[in-house]
Design a protein with these regions (language model features):
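Alpha-helical transmembrane segments and terminal signal-anchor/GPI-anchor hydrophobic tails
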Residues: 12-15, 21-28, 148-265, 309-330, ...
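Membrane-interface transmembrane helices that cradle and orient dolichyl/undecaprenyl
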Residues: 112-126
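Short acidic/glycine- and proline-prone juxtamembrane loop motifs at membrane-interface regions
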Residues: 100-106
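Loop-to-helix entry region of an early transmembrane alpha helix in multi-pass inner-membrane enzymes
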Residues: 41, 53-70
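Transmembrane-helix signature of polytopic, membrane-embedded enzymes
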Residues: 73-93
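Signature aromatic-anchored transmembrane alpha helix within multi-pass, membrane-resident enzymes
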Residues: 165-169, 282-303
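Short hydrophobic/aromatic helix or loop-helix immediately within or flanking a transmembrane segment
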Residues: 12-20, 33-55
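Membrane-interface alpha helices of multi-pass inner-membrane proteins
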Residues: 95, 126-150, 246-253
Length: 348
């Protein structure tokens, strides 16, 4: 994906921003670095460094892809036994999304994947240093700062508590979301127009209706299955990731934009899930459930790619999410896909 040409949704926006981004020599001129434009400092510095090398946006894509996938596959090599299964699931389910849709946030996700072992081992100094780096790429990483507080509660739950504790936490946090955003907007997000708009969109968003909640819970069945098995195996680090994934998914049902917090836990979830569904003992006892969970996981991602693209007027009936990836063009066969270009314009 690093060599793609005009493929992806947010990628096209970042390419537009990059066209008028400053290089390093321009960035450090007095008054040139404008934090109010919304991008976090390390992302701005990253763009400037790439701009210093070349004006071609492909350099941003290449570095982004190298860092993100390098971290994901390096950690998979250390953590995952069934690596090929993980690669297949990642490639078909989330590879386009992480590499083209959330370029800034994907770097923060990579930082969290690297830093999670420090959280598990209680090395909070290193963990928080990595969290600061993640936050400097994407503001949503501020959420990672509270994970050490939540770890004792969400890594030891057993039985029905494994499902109840994340629900209670999520409902309490959802109740105070407006208060939390107000504090952030008056401190860390002060004078940042982009983050102010994002906060406003969160508060104005509507949650899922009953049918939406039921559908979302059905799509989370693979997660529930992993939670059930992890309780029996007693691995705290796995149980915490699964509970956090459930926790942010519930918040996302109340405030839809906040469902993106789940991005931080998707890859670690796939690490766990890839080994779990091929464990001989688990297959022997739960093969029908494993098969059902795989089908639901595939369905949930397929439904995402087949849904109409979001616009100011709701979901489009003309353009679908897969239109931003298909057909694929690389820098070696540069071609503008007019349908994709129109679809992206619809979102502005």
């Amino acid at each position: 994906m690093g060599l793609r040409f005009r493929v992806g949704g947010d990628s096209l926006r970042y390419e537009m921003y990059f066209s008028y981004a400053k290089d390093l020599s321009e960035l450090f001129v007095k008054g040139a670095w404008d934090l109010s434009e919304g991008f976090q400092p390390l992302w701005t510095l990253y763009q400037a460094a790439c701009k210093t090398i070349t004006d071609d946006f492909v350099i941003v894509q290449l570095v982004n892809s190298f860092v993100l996938n390098g971290v994901i596959f390096y950690c998979a090599a250390k953590e995952v036994r069934h690596r090929f299964t993980f690669v297949v699931l990642y490639y078909f389910l989330y590879y386009p999304y992480f590499n083209t849709e959330i370029m800034r946030e994907s770097l923060a996700v990579a930082m969290f994947i690297v830093g999670y072992r420090f959280l598990v081992n209680g090395n909070y100094v290193k963990y928080y240093l990595i969290c600061v780096v993640a936050f400097m790429f994407h503001a949503s990483a501020i959420f990672l700062m509270v994970l050490p507080v939540m770890y004792p509660f969400l890594s030891k739950s057993r039985g029905w508590k494994s499902y109840l504790v994340p629900i209670v936490f999520a409902l309490v946090v959802s109740y105070y979301v407006s208060f939390i955003l107000e504090i952030l907007n008056s401190t860390l997000f002060l004078d940042n127009a982009l983050l102010g708009d994002k906060s406003e969109s969160v508060l104005q968003s509507e949650g899922l209706n009953v049918f939406g909640i039921i559908g979302q819970l059905a799509c989370l069945f693979p997660l529930f299955f992993c939670m059930y098995i992890s309780q029996k195996r007693g691995k705290k680090s796995d149980l915490f990731i699964l509970n956090m994934y459930f926790f942010v998914s519930i918040i996302g049902m109340v405030y839809l934009p906040l469902v993106r917090l789940a991005n931080y836990f998707i890859i670690p979830f796939l690490y766990i899930y890839s080994d779990m569904i091929l464990n001989p003992e688990i297959l022997r006892k739960y093969r029908p459930i494993v098969n059902l969970s795989v089908c639901l996981l595939l369905y949930s991602r397929l439904s995402y790619y087949c849904q109409g693209m979001a616009s100011t007027e709701g979901r489009s009936k003309e353009f679908y999410m897969y239109d931003i990836y298909i057909p694929y063009h690389s820098v070696f066969d540069k071609e503008y896909d007019m349908k994709r270009e129109r679809a992206i314009e619809l979102q502005f």
